[in-house]
Amino acid sequence: MLESTALFSATTIHLDRLMCAFNCMTPFGQRDDVLITIDRDGLTFIRQNNHAAEIQLFLAKELFQYYSIREGFEGEIQLCMKLNHLLDTVSVANRDKDDVVECTLSYDGEGTPFMLILEDSMITEQVEYATYLVGEMDRTGLELDRARLEFECILKGDVLYSALRDLREIGCKECYLYIVTSSRARPMFALVSRGQLGLSKIILPSERSVLEKLEVYENDSTTLIHDAPVIGLFDFAALDKLRPSTKIASKVLIRKDVHGLLAVNILSDTNAILVPEKRELIRASRSVSAEYPTVVIEVFLLEKASVGDIDVRDVHQLMLTSPAHRRSGFADSGSRIVSVTPTATSAAHTGAGSLLGLAPPSAFPAEETQDPDESYHPAPSNTDIPLFL
C-alpha cells in the first residue's frame, strides 16, 4: 500500500482548501519554483519574490484525514517543484462538485517524483512531478525582529481585503500605512494612497469587532506609546499581493519592525489563530472542526528604501484634516519615520513631540458617544503567548 511504504504520504478531501491556499501564492510567481518542507506538523511552501517579498504557506496535518512520515525518520524533508503544476492539477480535480475526490500527496525522498493521486467513485489518476533540491534559501532582511517592533495590530481579514481592492481601483502606486493610538480615544489604522489622483485615504473602522488590537511601541516591542503616529511607505504592487490571502482570512495580524520589514500573518476559516513560529501549539488545537482545517499564511514585505520628509509631511497633514482624527483628540506630535536599507537601520523622530517624556500608558475609557458595549479595551501585550486570541 502506497501510504505505508512512501517516506511521506497524506490524504485529504479538502481540495477546495488546497486550491484557495495555492492561489494565495500565485501573485508571488505562479510559474516559479516553490520550496516545500515537510515535517510531522505539516507542510510548508515558501516562495520569494526578488528578495523583497516572501510568502510562507503552512498546511497543518489537521487538514488531512491521513498523514504519515516513515517511522524512524528524523528531521525535515525538503524538495523544490513548480507551483503551477500543483495548482493546475488541484484546480482540475476540484471542478466536480457532485462527487467527493480524495487527494493523496506522496513523496519517497531525494531522486523520486512528488506524486498526486486523485480518486473518486469512478476513476483513479496519478500525476508525477519532477523534483530537485536547492541550497539554503537566503532570508537576509526577511526575518522579523520580534524584539524591536514598531507596532502590531489584529483586524478582520475581509476589511483589509476591501481596502486593498479599493486602493487598486483608484490606481494606487504607493501606499502609506498610518498608525496612531491615544490614551483618550480609539486607535486609528489608515491606508493612504498616492497615485494619479494625488493623495487619498482609507480609514479602517476602529470598533473592537473590526480592529481587535492596535499597539504602538517605542521600538522595543514592550513599551507602549501614544499620540506618536507611525508612517511606513510600501510599493502598492507588492502590498497588493496580499489581497488573495486576505480574501479568505478570518483575522490578520500585522507587525512592523524598526528595520522596515512588514510581517502579515493570516489564518483561514478558523477561530484558532496561531502564529507560524508557535507551531508546537497546533497540537493543542486539534479540537478544531474538520470543516475548518488550519491554513496559515505568513507574508513578509520590505519597506521602500527611503521616505521623503516632504511626502511624510503631506501624509501627516492629510490625516490631521480627517474628521475622525479631530474627534479623537490626537495630539499633533511629530510622526515617527524609519528610513531603511536592506542592511542598515536608522530611526528619526521628527516634530516637537518627545516620546521619552510620555507617562506610562493606561487603558482609556470609552468615548461618551459610544455604546458601553462598544468601548475599546486594548488586548494585553504578551510576547510569550500567541498574539491571536
From Swiss-Prot:
Q: Where in the cell is it found?
A: Nucleus
The principal location of this protein is nucleus
GO terms under cellular component: checkpoint clamp complex
Q: Where is the composition biased (Polar residues)?
A: 380-389
Q: Please name the Pfam families in this protein's record.
A: Rad1
Record GO terms (molecular function) = damaged DNA binding; double-stranded DNA binding; nuclease activity
Give the residue ranges for region: Disordered: 358-389
Keywords for the protein's UniProt record, in alphabetical order: DNA damage, DNA repair, DNA-binding, Hydrolase, Nuclease, Nucleus
One Gene Ontology term of the biological-process aspect is: double-strand break repair
Quaternary structure, from the entry:
Component of the checkpoint clamp complex composed of DDC1, MEC3 and RAD17.
Family, as annotated: Belongs to the rad1 family.
What does this protein's UniProt record list under function? Component of the checkpoint clamp complex involved in the surveillance mechanism that allows the DNA repair pathways to act to restore the integrity of the DNA prior to DNA synthesis or separation of the replicated chromosomes.
What protein name is recorded for this chain?
Answer: DNA damage checkpoint control protein RAD17
Q: Which gene encodes it?
A: RAD17
